[in-house]
Amino acid sequence: MPADRPLTNSVIARWEGGWRCRVTAAGFDLVVDEPESAGGTGAGPMPTEYLLAAMSSCYALALCWSAGKRGVHLPDLTVTATGTYDGPRFSGLVLEVATSAPAEVVSPLIKPALRACYVSNTIASSPPIEVVIAGAPP
């Protein structure tokens, strides 16, 4: 691939009625739905929960990558992403890192991992969103 051509990645969401979609990503199917209290069937996480899942998992992997590059062993790791709703968006996002590794070992990994995390970088840079009408779905 030419160096001047950016890499791209796509996922497909197919509406299944109500508040439910089936998303295909890398050959995997994900169900997206709203809770019953919001008119959905509760058959899957909400889109915003998938956003938080993407952020927490991407940061966890970036943190492990950052540790590996520095020869640091993390015996265990949990990353919790929490978003604060403010109308139709999150007004704030918090990543909470839990590990039995000492804080003085983990602290130097935090910023490099944040720089390496595609999801947090994308959210922080707020890229423009273009909507294109493609015609009838396949």
Protein language model features and the residues they cover:
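Extended beta-strand/beta-hairpin segments
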Residues: 1-53, 61-138
